[in-house]
C-alpha cells in the first residue's frame, strides 16, 4: 500500500493538506501550460510504487473459482503508473474500497481474483483519463484483458460507469449517450447545487425521468459566480465556493478540462501585515507559525491519550490550555500572529475553534486531493452552467414537505405537489438543522441526531472591483492582523482574482466569530473598514488605493437556502455522522447528497459533486431491486423457482458463516433491525436423546417439524427470517450448533421452515440483496468458506 501522512489544515488561505508521500513521487503530464507559469493541467496522472498483497490470513480461506484464473495477469508495463492514477481517483492502490465490496465486484475479498480485478480497474481508469472527452466502451479492453478474466472486466467496467468514475461530465461524447426518452422510474431532486446537478445528469443518462426543484432563481447553490461591472470594467467574482482544493483526480478538474480550460495555480506566497500596516517581521512570522504547529501536534497527542473523552473537548480549549502553559511573556505582534493562525483554522473549517471537535476536527485529512489549489478562469459558474445544460430545473420552487412511503414520494413546493418514485434531498446541512423541510414520516432518530451533532459554519466575503490593480502582482494572497481576538477573522485574508476574473478583483474574507457579526454590519461600513486596511498597507509605500467601482458583501448565514457555508465536525460529532447523514431512508425512496454527506471530502465543491454521482448509483440500484420485487409479487408461483435459484447463489458467498449456519443480509443497510435470512444445513439424521436434561437443549420444536425428513434425506436445509442484530447475536452463542439451535428456537422463538415456507416477504429480501450485488459473477460450483465451531 502507498502510505499517506495525515497533515493538518495549516496552509495559509484555504488549507492545502498536502500528501507528502504522493507528491514526492514523479507525476507525469503535469506540465505548465503556455502563456502563464501559474496555469496547470486540471487533471494529471501519477506514477509510483504498487505493491501487490494477497490476503490470506488465519481467519480467511482464499477461494479460487474456475474460469477466473489462478495467477496474476499482465495487462501492460504501466501497472505502477495506473495504480497511482487510481489512487488519485480515490481508490486504494492495491485493495478494494468499501463501496466496491458492497457492490460485489469480486466473488471473494482477497486472493488472485481481487488482484486481477484491481489491475483491470486501474487500467480502465487510466484509459479513460488519457482522453476524458471520449466514451470508453468495454469492447476497447477485450484485446488487452485475458478472456478468462472477462467476468472481472464486466464487473470493473460496470462498477466504474455506474458510480461515475469514468464516462462522466459534459463532453459531447458523453452527452450523446443520453437517451432520447426516459424509460425508467421518475426522480425528484431537491436542489440544483453541484450534488444535485451531478446526480441529475447521471440519472438522466441512466434513463430516469428527472425533475430538479430549486428555490433560487439560479443553479449552483453555494457555488455562485457574480458578474461585476462598472465603467466598462468587469470581473467574474466567486462569492461562494471558489478554490479547487487539489487537482490530482479532482472530478471538477476533469470537467474544467472538458470545457477546454486550464486552471490557475494559487501561489503559496502570503505576506502578513500588522495592524499599523507594516509588514510582519519574517523571523517573528516563522517563529509563531512553528509554535502554532507545535501546539497542534500537542493537541493531536492529547486526543490520543484521552481516547473517547476527546470527543467532548474542543480543539480551541486544548490549544488555549497549551498556549497558556507554554508562554508567559508574549509580544503583542506574536499574539496577533497567533490569532491570525486561529482565524485561518476557522476559515478552513467554517467553524469556531471553540466548537470544533478535538478528536475529529481533521478526520478527513488522509483523503485530501493531492496537487495544487487552483482557480478556474472566469469563475466556477462555468462549471455550474455546463452541468445545468439541458437538465430540467424548475426555479423558485421552495420545498416545504417531502413525503415518502412504499408507493413513492410526494414533494410539496408552494401550492404544487410533485410525485415520483424516489427523491434526492441535496439541501445544505444548515437547512436540515433549521427544519425548513418537513419529512413525512419523520426522519429516523439516528439521522436527526447526526444532523444536530454536525457543525455548520460560516464564511463571508467582500468582493471589490477596482479600476486597476494597485497591489503586488507577484502574489495571490496576503493577510492582515487585528488587535481584538474577537474580530481576528475580520478581513484577515485577501485573495487577488485579477489573473482569472477579467478585471482588478480583490476579495476580503471574514471568518470565525467575525463572520457572524458581519451578517448585520451595513455594507458601507464593511467596505469602509476594508479600504482603511488597504490604505494603511499601501499608502505608506506611496501607492494610491482608489475607491472601488463596485462592491458586494455576502450574507450566507442569512440566505434561507443555505443558512451557512459548509460543514465541520463539532464537539460530540465524528466522521461517522457524515455516513449516517448519507444513508437512504424509507426502503430506497428518500436519498441524501451534498458536501455534508461525505466523510472523505466534506466542505469541498468536489465532495458535493461526487456525492451526487454516488447517490445516482444508489438510486439506480434501488430502482432495480424494486423492479425485481414487483415482478416477483405479480407472479409469485412463476418466480418461486427463480427465487430458489437466487437464494442458492447468494448463500455461496454468505455474509456470516459459522458451524452449520449461514446468513445473508444487505451490506448497504447497517440498521440492526434490517432483515436477514438464515440457513441451517443438517447433514445427517439426529437421534433423539432420551436424557430429559439433554432434551432441554436439543431443539424439540425443530425435531418435531422435521423428524420425517430426517428419516428420508441425508441433508436438509431449513430457513428463517430474522434481524441483522439477531444474526450477530446468534454468532456469539457458544457451545456449538445445539446451543445455537436452542437459542434460535427457544430464546428468539423463531420457526425454521423449508424454502417455500419463507413466503413473499423473504422473496422481497432475496431480490433486494441480489440486486445490490449485481455485477458479481458467482461460480457454478459450491465451495467451502471459513467456519467456526
Swiss-Prot record:
Family annotation (InterPro entries): Amino_oxidase, FAD/NAD-bd_sf, Flavin_monoamine_oxidase, Homeodomain-like_sf, SWIRM, WH-like_DNA-bd_sf
| Deletion consequences | Delayed flowering. Impaired systemic acquired resistance (SAR) toward pathogenic bacteria (e.g. Pseudomonas syringae pv tomato DC3000 (avrPto)). Lost ability of dehydroabietinal-dependent (DA, a diterpenoid tricyclic diterpene) to trigger flowering and systemic acquired resistance (SAR).
Q: For the region Disordered, give the residue spans.
A: 1-23
EC number(s) reported in the record: 1.-.-.-
Q: Could you tell me which Pfam families the record lists for this protein? A: Amino_oxidase, SWIRM
**GO molecular-function terms, A-Z:** oxidoreductase activity
- Which superkingdom heads the taxonomic lineage of this protein's source? Eukaryota
A biological process (GO) of this protein is: systemic acquired resistance
Q: What induces it?
A: Induced by dehydroabietinal-dependent (DA), a diterpenoid tricyclic diterpene that promotes flowering and systemic acquired resistance (SAR).
The coenzyme or cofactor needed here is:
FAD
Pinpoint the SWIRM domain residues.
Answer: 76-177
Q: What is the effect of changing residue 640 to T?
A: In strain: cv. Lz-0
Question: Which keywords annotate this record?
Answer: Chromatin regulator, FAD, Flavoprotein, Isopeptide bond, Oxidoreductase, Repressor, Transcription, Transcription regulation, Ubl conjugation
Q: Where is this cross-link: Glycyl lysine isopeptide (Lys-Gly) (interchain with G-Cter in SUMO)?
A: 287, 693, 770
SUPFAM superfamilies in alphabetical order: FAD-linked reductases, C-terminal domain, FAD/NAD(P)-binding domain, Homeodomain-like
Cite the binding residues for FAD: 195, 214, 216, 222, 240-243, 595, 604-605, 607-612
Q: What's the PTM story here?
A: Sumoylated at Lys-287, Lys-693 and Lys-770 by SIZ1. Sumoylation alters its activity and the histone H4 acetylation status of FLC locus, promoting FLC expression.
Cite the PROSITE patterns for this sequence: SWIRM (PS50934)
State what changing residue 686 to L does: In strain: cv. Lz-0
What's the family?
Belongs to the flavin monoamine oxidase family.
Q: What does this protein do?
A: Probable histone demethylase that promotes flowering independently of the photoperiod and vernalization pathways by repressing FLOWERING LOCUS C (FLC), a floral repressor that blocks the transition from vegetative to reproductive development. Probably mediates histone H3 'Lys-4' demethylation at FLC locus. Seems to act in partial redundancy with LDL1 and LDL2 to repress FLC expression. Required for histone H4 deacetylation of FLC locus. May be a component of the histone deacetylase complex.
Its subunit composition reads:
Interacts with HDA6.
PANTHER family linked: FLAVIN MONOAMINE OXIDASE (PTHR10742), PROTEIN FLOWERING LOCUS D (PTHR10742:SF260)
- This protein is called Protein FLOWERING LOCUS D
Species: Arabidopsis thaliana
Amino acid at each position: 500500500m502507498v502510505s499517506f501522512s495525515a497533515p493538518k489544515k495549516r496552509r495559509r488561505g484555504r488549507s492545502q493538506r498536502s500528501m507528502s508521500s504522493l507528491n514526492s513521487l514523479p507525476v507525469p503530464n503535469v506540465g505548465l501550460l503556455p502563456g502563464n507559469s501559474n496555469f496547470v493541467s486540471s487533471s494529471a496522472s501519477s506514477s509510483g510504487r504498487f505493491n501487490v498483497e494477497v490476503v490470506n490470513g488465519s481467519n480467511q480461506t482464499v477461494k479460487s473459482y474456475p474460469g477466473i484464473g489462478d495467477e496474476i495477469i499482465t495487462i501492460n508495463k504501466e501497472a505502477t503508473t495506473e495504480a497511482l492514477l487510481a489512487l488519485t481517483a480515490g481508490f486504494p492502490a492495491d485493495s478494494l474500497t468499501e463501496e466496491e465490496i458492497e457492490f460485489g465486484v469480486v466473488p471473494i475479498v482477497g486472493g488472485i481474483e481481487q488482484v486481477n480485478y484491481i489491475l483491470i480497474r486501474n487500467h480502465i481508469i487510466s484509459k479513460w483519463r488519457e482522453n476524458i472527452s471520449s466514451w470508453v466502451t468495454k469492447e476497447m479492453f477485450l484485446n488487452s484483458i485475458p478472456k478468462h478474466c472477462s467476468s472481472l472486466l464486466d464487473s470493473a467496467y460496470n462498477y466504474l460507469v455506474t458510480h461515475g468514475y469514468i464516462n462522466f461530465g459534459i463532453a459531447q461524447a458523453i452527452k450523446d449517450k443520453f437517451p432520447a426518452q426516459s424509460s425508467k422510474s421518475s426522480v425528484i431532486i431537491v436542489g440544483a447545487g453541484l450534488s444535485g446537478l451531478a446526480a441529475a445528469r447521471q440519472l438522466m443518462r441512466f434513463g430516469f425521468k428527472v425533475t430538479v426543484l430549486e428555490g433560487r432563481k439560479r443553479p449552483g447553490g453555494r457555488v455562485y459566480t457574480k458578474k461585476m461591472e462598472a465603467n466598462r470594467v468587469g470581473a467574474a467574482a466567486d462569492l461562494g465556493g471558489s478554490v479547487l482544493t487539489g487537482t490530482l483526480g479532482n472530478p471538477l478538474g476533469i470537467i474544467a478540462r472538458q470545457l477546454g480550460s486550464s486552471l490557475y495555480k494559487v501561489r503559496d506566497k502570503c505576506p502578513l501585515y500588522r495592524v499599523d500596516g507594516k509588514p510582519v517581521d519574517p523571523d517573528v512570522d516563522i517563529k509563531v507559525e512553528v509554535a502554532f504547529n507545535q501546539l497542534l501536534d500537542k493537541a493531536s497527542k492529547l486526543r490520543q491519550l484521552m481516547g473517547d473523552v476527546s470527543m467532548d473537548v474542543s480543539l480551541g480549549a486544548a490549544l488555549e490550555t497549551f498556549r497558556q502553559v507554554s508562554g508567559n511573556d508574549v509580544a503583542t505582534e506574536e499574539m496577533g500572529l497567533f490569532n491570525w493562525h486561529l482565524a485561518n483554522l476557522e476559515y478552513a473549517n467554517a467553524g469556531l475553534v471553540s466548537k470544533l471537535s478535538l478528536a475529529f476536527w481533521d478526520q478527513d485529512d488522509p483523503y485530501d486531493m493531492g496537487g495544487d489549489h487552483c482557480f478556474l478562469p472566469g469563475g466556477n459558474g462555468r462549471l455550474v452552467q455546463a452541468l445545468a445544460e439541458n437538465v430540467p430545473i424548475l426555479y423558485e420552487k421552495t420545498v416545504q414537505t417531502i413525503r415518502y412511503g412504499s408507493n413513492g414520494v410526494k414533494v410539496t413546493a408552494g401550492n404544487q405537489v410533485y410525485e415520483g418514485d424516489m427523491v434526492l434531498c441535496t439541501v445544505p446541512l444548515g437547512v436540515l438543522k433549521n427544519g425548513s423541510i418537513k419529512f413525512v414520516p419523520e426522519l429516523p432518530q439516528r439521522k436527526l441526531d447526526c444532523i444536530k451533532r454536525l457543525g455548520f459554519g460560516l464564511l463571508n466575503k467582500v468582493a471589490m472591483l477596482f479600476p486597476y490593480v494597485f497591489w503586488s502582482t507577484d502574489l495571490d494572497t496576503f493577510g492582515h492582523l487585528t488587535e481584538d481576538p474577537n474580530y481576528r477573522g475580520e478581513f484577515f485574508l485577501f485573495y487577488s482574482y485579477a489573473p482569472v476574473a477579467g478585471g482588478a478583483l480583490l476579495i476580503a474574507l471574514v471568518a470565525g466569530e467575525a463572520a457572524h457579526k458581519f451578517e448585520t454590519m451595513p455594507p458601507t461600513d464593511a467596505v469602509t473598514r476594508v479600504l482603511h486596511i488597504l490604505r494603511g498597507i499601501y499608502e505608506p509605500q506611496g501607492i494610491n488605493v482608489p475607491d472601488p467601482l463596485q462592491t458586494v458583501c455576502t450574507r450566507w448565514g442569512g440566505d434561507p437556502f443555505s443558512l451557512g457555508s459548509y460543514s465541520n465536525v463539532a464537539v460530540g460529532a465524528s466522521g461517522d455522522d457524515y455516513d449516517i447523514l448519507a444513508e437512504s431512508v424509507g426502503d430506497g425512496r428518500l436519498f441524501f447528497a451534498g458536501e455534508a454527506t461525505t466523510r472523505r471530502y466534506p466542505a469541498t465543491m468536489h465532495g458535493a459533486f461526487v456525492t451526487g454521482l454516488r447517490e445516482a448509483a444508489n438510486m439506480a440500484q434501488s430502482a432495480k431491486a424494486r423492479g425485481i420485487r414487483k415482478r416477483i409479487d405479480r407472479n409469485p408461483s412463476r418466480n418461486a423457482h427463480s427465487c430458489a435459484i437466487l437464494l442458492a447463489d447468494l448463500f455461496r458467498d454468505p455474509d456470516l458463516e459459522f458451524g452449520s449456519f449461514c446468513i445473508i443480509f444487505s451490506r448497504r443497510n447497517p440498521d440492526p433491525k434490517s432483515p436477514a435470512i438464515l440457513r441451517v444445513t443438517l447433514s445427517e439424521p439426529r437421534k433423539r436423546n432420551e436424557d430429559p436434561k439433554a432434551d432441554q437443549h436439543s431443539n424439540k420444536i425443530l425435531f418435531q417439524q422435521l423428524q420425517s425428513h430426517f428419516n428420508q434425506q441425508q441433508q436438509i436445509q431449513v430457513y428463517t427470517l430474522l434481524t441483522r442484530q439477531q444474526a450477530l447475536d446468534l454468532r456469539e452463542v457458544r457451545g456449538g450448533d445445539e446451543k445455537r439451535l436452542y437459542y434460535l428456537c427457544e430464546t428468539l422463538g423463531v420457526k425454521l421452515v423449508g424454502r417455500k415456507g419463507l413466503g413473499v416477504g423473504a422473496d422481497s429480501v432475496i431480490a433486494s440483496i441480489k440486486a445490490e450485488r449485481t455485477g458479481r459473477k458467482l461460480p457454478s460450483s459450491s465451495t467451502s468458506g471459513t467456519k467456526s465451531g
